[in-house]
Amino acid sequence: MAVFKAITTEQVEILTAGLYAGVDEVGRGPLVGNVVTAAVILDPTKPITGLNDSKKLSEKKREALFTEIHEKALAISIGYASPEEIDELNILHATMLAMQRAVAGLDMAPTSVLVDGNRTPDFSHGEDTDRNIESHAIIKGDGLVAGISAASIVAKVIRDREMDLLDMEHPQYGFAKHKGYPTKAHFEALALHGVLPEHRKSFRPVKERLAKN
Protein backbone atom coordinates (compact mmCIF):
# COMPACT_ATOMS: atom_id res chain seq x y z
CA MET A 1 0.00 0.00 0.00
CA ALA A 2 1.52 3.30 -1.10
CA VAL A 3 2.40 5.89 1.51
CA PHE A 4 3.33 9.48 0.69
CA LYS A 5 5.33 12.07 2.59
CA ALA A 6 3.29 14.58 4.57
CA ILE A 7 3.16 18.13 3.26
CA THR A 8 3.92 21.28 5.20
CA THR A 9 1.20 23.59 6.48
CA GLU A 10 2.40 26.31 4.10
CA GLN A 11 1.04 24.26 1.20
CA VAL A 12 -2.43 23.87 2.65
CA GLU A 13 -3.88 27.03 1.11
CA ILE A 14 -2.89 25.92 -2.39
CA LEU A 15 -4.28 22.41 -1.95
CA THR A 16 -7.63 23.56 -0.60
CA ALA A 17 -8.36 25.77 -3.61
CA GLY A 18 -10.33 23.08 -5.48
CA LEU A 19 -13.14 20.71 -4.55
CA TYR A 20 -10.93 18.48 -2.45
CA ALA A 21 -12.10 15.65 -0.22
CA GLY A 22 -11.11 15.84 3.43
CA VAL A 23 -10.56 12.42 5.01
CA ASP A 24 -10.13 11.37 8.63
CA GLU A 25 -10.57 8.30 10.80
CA VAL A 26 -11.92 7.52 14.24
CA GLY A 27 -11.40 4.32 16.17
CA ARG A 28 -7.83 3.16 15.75
CA GLY A 29 -7.25 2.85 19.50
CA PRO A 30 -10.37 1.05 20.78
CA LEU A 31 -10.42 -2.65 21.56
CA VAL A 32 -13.78 -3.20 19.91
CA GLY A 33 -15.75 -2.33 16.78
CA ASN A 34 -15.02 -0.92 13.35
CA VAL A 35 -12.49 1.71 12.46
CA VAL A 36 -14.62 4.40 10.81
CA THR A 37 -13.45 6.86 8.18
CA ALA A 38 -15.24 9.71 6.45
CA ALA A 39 -14.60 11.57 3.20
CA VAL A 40 -16.24 14.98 2.87
CA ILE A 41 -16.30 17.45 -0.02
CA LEU A 42 -17.45 20.80 1.32
CA ASP A 43 -19.24 23.44 -0.75
CA PRO A 44 -16.99 26.55 -0.76
CA THR A 45 -20.09 28.74 -1.20
CA LYS A 46 -21.60 27.40 2.04
CA PRO A 47 -19.05 27.89 4.83
CA ILE A 48 -19.56 26.15 8.16
CA THR A 49 -18.56 27.99 11.31
CA GLY A 50 -16.95 26.14 14.21
CA LEU A 51 -15.26 23.26 12.39
CA ASN A 52 -12.36 21.80 14.37
CA ASP A 53 -10.76 18.56 15.41
CA SER A 54 -13.68 16.46 16.69
CA LYS A 55 -11.76 15.63 19.89
CA LYS A 56 -11.77 19.33 20.82
CA LEU A 57 -15.54 19.67 20.49
CA SER A 58 -18.28 18.74 22.94
CA GLU A 59 -20.70 15.98 21.99
CA LYS A 60 -23.49 18.56 21.63
CA LYS A 61 -21.37 20.70 19.29
CA ARG A 62 -20.34 17.67 17.23
CA GLU A 63 -23.94 16.62 16.76
CA ALA A 64 -24.96 20.13 15.67
CA LEU A 65 -22.08 20.34 13.20
CA PHE A 66 -22.80 16.80 11.96
CA THR A 67 -26.27 17.96 10.92
CA GLU A 68 -24.96 21.15 9.31
CA ILE A 69 -22.26 19.27 7.41
CA HIS A 70 -24.88 16.93 5.95
CA GLU A 71 -27.03 19.90 4.98
CA LYS A 72 -24.25 21.87 3.26
CA ALA A 73 -21.61 19.42 1.97
CA LEU A 74 -21.47 18.49 -1.70
CA ALA A 75 -20.65 14.86 -0.93
CA ILE A 76 -20.13 12.64 2.12
CA SER A 77 -19.09 9.00 2.25
CA ILE A 78 -18.31 6.63 5.12
CA GLY A 79 -15.79 3.80 4.94
CA TYR A 80 -15.39 1.00 7.45
CA ALA A 81 -12.94 -1.74 8.29
CA SER A 82 -14.31 -4.49 10.48
CA PRO A 83 -12.68 -6.04 13.55
CA GLU A 84 -11.96 -9.12 11.42
CA GLU A 85 -10.17 -6.99 8.82
CA ILE A 86 -8.26 -5.18 11.55
CA ASP A 87 -7.10 -8.52 12.95
CA GLU A 88 -6.11 -9.78 9.50
CA LEU A 89 -4.41 -6.66 8.13
CA ASN A 90 -3.35 -4.76 11.31
CA ILE A 91 -4.92 -1.48 12.36
CA LEU A 92 -2.83 0.76 10.08
CA HIS A 93 -3.57 -1.11 6.87
CA ALA A 94 -7.21 -1.59 7.84
CA THR A 95 -7.50 2.17 8.37
CA MET A 96 -5.97 2.85 4.95
CA LEU A 97 -8.44 0.39 3.41
CA ALA A 98 -11.37 2.11 5.12
CA MET A 99 -10.16 5.47 3.79
CA GLN A 100 -10.02 4.06 0.27
CA ARG A 101 -13.58 2.82 0.67
CA ALA A 102 -14.77 6.22 1.88
CA VAL A 103 -13.27 8.07 -1.09
CA ALA A 104 -14.49 5.44 -3.55
CA GLY A 105 -18.02 5.93 -2.21
CA LEU A 106 -18.18 9.65 -2.94
CA ASP A 107 -20.88 10.69 -5.42
CA MET A 108 -18.46 13.03 -7.17
CA ALA A 109 -14.74 12.87 -7.90
CA PRO A 110 -12.66 15.27 -5.80
CA THR A 111 -9.83 17.33 -7.28
CA SER A 112 -7.55 15.85 -4.61
CA VAL A 113 -7.72 14.07 -1.26
CA LEU A 114 -6.33 15.58 1.93
CA VAL A 115 -5.87 13.14 4.81
CA ASP A 116 -5.25 13.89 8.47
CA GLY A 117 -1.95 12.50 9.69
CA ASN A 118 1.45 11.64 8.25
CA ARG A 119 0.47 9.04 5.65
CA THR A 120 -2.18 8.36 3.06
CA PRO A 121 -3.20 5.36 0.98
CA ASP A 122 -3.13 5.39 -2.81
CA PHE A 123 -6.65 6.44 -3.77
CA SER A 124 -6.06 5.77 -7.47
CA HIS A 125 -6.10 1.99 -7.10
CA GLY A 126 -8.32 1.07 -4.17
CA GLU A 127 -10.49 -2.03 -4.14
CA ASP A 128 -13.50 -0.11 -5.49
CA THR A 129 -11.98 2.59 -7.68
CA ASP A 130 -9.63 3.30 -10.54
CA ARG A 131 -9.82 7.08 -10.24
CA ASN A 132 -6.59 9.00 -10.76
CA ILE A 133 -6.63 11.04 -7.56
CA GLU A 134 -3.74 12.95 -6.01
CA SER A 135 -3.54 12.70 -2.23
CA HIS A 136 -1.62 14.46 0.53
CA ALA A 137 -1.22 13.81 4.25
CA ILE A 138 -1.44 16.84 6.52
CA ILE A 139 -0.20 16.54 10.08
CA LYS A 140 -2.86 17.87 12.47
CA GLY A 141 -5.01 18.47 9.41
CA ASP A 142 -8.20 18.06 11.42
CA GLY A 143 -7.43 21.41 13.02
CA LEU A 144 -6.09 23.11 9.89
CA VAL A 145 -8.31 22.09 6.97
CA ALA A 146 -12.08 22.56 7.06
CA GLY A 147 -12.82 19.46 5.00
CA ILE A 148 -10.69 17.25 7.22
CA SER A 149 -12.31 18.76 10.31
CA ALA A 150 -15.71 17.94 8.83
CA ALA A 151 -14.61 14.37 8.11
CA SER A 152 -13.30 14.06 11.67
CA ILE A 153 -16.66 15.15 13.07
CA VAL A 154 -18.71 12.89 10.79
CA ALA A 155 -16.57 9.84 11.55
CA LYS A 156 -16.63 10.54 15.30
CA VAL A 157 -20.41 10.89 15.47
CA ILE A 158 -20.95 7.76 13.38
CA ARG A 159 -18.62 5.64 15.49
CA ASP A 160 -19.95 6.96 18.79
CA ARG A 161 -23.45 6.02 17.66
CA GLU A 162 -22.21 2.53 16.83
CA MET A 163 -20.84 2.23 20.34
CA ASP A 164 -24.14 3.45 21.79
CA LEU A 165 -25.95 0.69 19.88
CA LEU A 166 -23.44 -1.91 21.06
CA ASP A 167 -23.97 -0.63 24.60
CA MET A 168 -27.70 -1.33 24.26
CA GLU A 169 -26.89 -4.92 23.28
CA HIS A 170 -24.22 -5.41 25.97
CA PRO A 171 -24.79 -2.81 28.72
CA GLN A 172 -22.46 -4.62 31.12
CA TYR A 173 -19.43 -3.44 29.11
CA GLY A 174 -20.14 0.30 29.36
CA PHE A 175 -19.47 1.05 25.70
CA ALA A 176 -21.60 4.21 25.77
CA LYS A 177 -19.15 5.73 28.25
CA HIS A 178 -15.70 4.61 27.09
CA LYS A 179 -16.56 4.03 23.39
CA GLY A 180 -14.50 0.86 23.35
CA TYR A 181 -11.22 2.47 24.36
CA PRO A 182 -8.86 0.61 26.73
CA THR A 183 -10.06 2.10 30.01
CA LYS A 184 -10.05 0.54 33.47
CA ALA A 185 -13.80 -0.05 33.21
CA HIS A 186 -13.36 -1.82 29.87
CA PHE A 187 -10.57 -4.02 31.24
CA GLU A 188 -12.75 -4.96 34.21
CA ALA A 189 -15.67 -5.81 31.92
CA LEU A 190 -13.40 -7.96 29.76
CA ALA A 191 -12.14 -9.82 32.81
CA LEU A 192 -15.64 -10.38 34.16
CA HIS A 193 -17.70 -10.99 31.02
CA GLY A 194 -15.21 -12.16 28.43
CA VAL A 195 -14.61 -11.29 24.79
CA LEU A 196 -17.39 -10.35 22.38
CA PRO A 197 -17.42 -11.13 18.63
CA GLU A 198 -16.99 -7.38 18.06
CA HIS A 199 -13.71 -7.27 19.98
CA ARG A 200 -10.42 -7.01 18.07
CA LYS A 201 -8.74 -10.32 18.82
CA SER A 202 -5.27 -9.12 17.77
CA PHE A 203 -5.19 -6.30 20.36
CA ARG A 204 -3.15 -7.33 23.38
CA PRO A 205 -5.73 -6.92 26.19
CA VAL A 206 -8.26 -8.94 24.18
CA LYS A 207 -5.68 -11.54 23.17
CA GLU A 208 -4.60 -11.92 26.80
CA ARG A 209 -8.20 -12.38 27.92
CA LEU A 210 -8.76 -15.05 25.27
CA ALA A 211 -5.67 -16.89 26.47
CA LYS A 212 -7.28 -17.28 29.90
CA ASN A 213 -10.33 -19.14 28.54
From Swiss-Prot:
Residues where a divalent metal cation binds: 24-25, 116
Q: Name one GO cellular component term.
A: cytoplasm
- Keyword Cytoplasm assigned to the entry: answer is yes
GO BP terms: namely: DNA replication, removal of RNA primer; mismatch repair
What cofactor(s) does the depicted protein rely on?
Mn(2+); Mg(2+)
Write out the entry's keywords from A to Z: Cytoplasm, Endonuclease, Hydrolase, Manganese, Metal-binding, Nuclease
Limits of the RNase H type-2 domain: 18-213
The molecular function terms of the Gene Ontology recorded here are: manganese ion binding; RNA binding; RNA-DNA hybrid ribonuclease activity
Bound cofactor: record note: Manganese or magnesium. Binds 1 divalent metal ion per monomer in the absence of substrate. May bind a second metal ion after substrate binding.
Q: List the subcellular locations.
A: Cytoplasm
User: Is NAD one of the keywords?
Assistant: no
According to its UniProt entry, the function of this protein is described as:
Endonuclease that specifically degrades the RNA of RNA-DNA hybrids.
Give the similarity note.
Belongs to the RNase HII family.
Its name, as the record gives it, is Ribonuclease HII
